[in-house]
A protein has these predicted regions:
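Short, hydrophobic alpha-helix immediately C-terminal to the catalytic nucleophile
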Residues: 49, 92, 116-120
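Short, glycine-/aromatic-enriched active-site segment of Class I SAM-dependent methyltransferases
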Residues: 140-149
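Conserved hydrolase catalytic core segment
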Residues: 101-140
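Alpha/beta-hydrolase fold catalytic core
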Residues: 1-35, 57-60, 100-101
Length: 175
């Protein structure tokens, strides 16, 4: 029997340093193993809405996370807080607030790094993991490409500018 898909709730939590964090909760009464979706470096929780809707319709609860400074989470004026340890603490606070003691994780890029770190630091928490756009070895050329554009993107005034910017950021991956 297929479950009734639920609309997501926008939830907020105060981080250890007082910053307001946002995440999406696609509830599903009676779900046993929640799925936690962790996005890439510059991406929001909304990236997972289609996946969350499908999983939710199958009876799974889904939590999708906005890291600090992304999506609807508050921007942090201290740039040193944009690091894996601080973000991992943020993720754990959300899971604690939601009563999640074990989950399946879907991690894209930086979210995959968080998933692997959580599996190392909290093996009791990670029951299953799906890693997207990341693996145990990180290609240096890819990191250099990302560094070229993160935090440096100009305003986009036209579709021509958007295409040029996509070619620049994606390199040879954009035909």
């Amino acid at each position: 029997m297929q479950a009734i898909p639920r609309s997501p709730f926008h939830r907020f939590l105060e981080a250890h340093d007082g910053l307001r964090l946002h995440y999406l909760d696609f509830p599903q009464p009676g779900a046993h193993l929640p799925v936690v979706c962790l996005p890439g470096l510059t991406r929001p929780a909304e990236d997972f809405e289609a996946l969350a809707a499908k999983l939710n319709a199958e009876g799974l609860r889904v939590l999708a996370f906005d890291y600090r400074g992304r999506g609807d989470s508050q921007w942090d004026a201290d740039w040193t807080h944009y690091d894996l340890d601080v973000e991992e603490d943020d993720i754990l606070r959300v899971l604690e607030q939601e009563g999640v003691s074990t989950a399946a994780f879907v991690g894209t890029s930086r979210g995959g790094i968080h998933t692997m770190r959580l599996a190392l630091h909290r093996p009791d928490l990670v029951r299953a993991a799906v890693l997207n756009d990341i693996g145990p070895e990180i290609n240096l050329a890819g990191l250099i490409r990302i560094k070229r554009y993160v935090g440096k993107l100009p305003p986009i005034a036209s579709i021509k500018d958007a295409i040029a910017l996509t070619r620049f950021t994606a390199g040879s991956d954009f035909a």
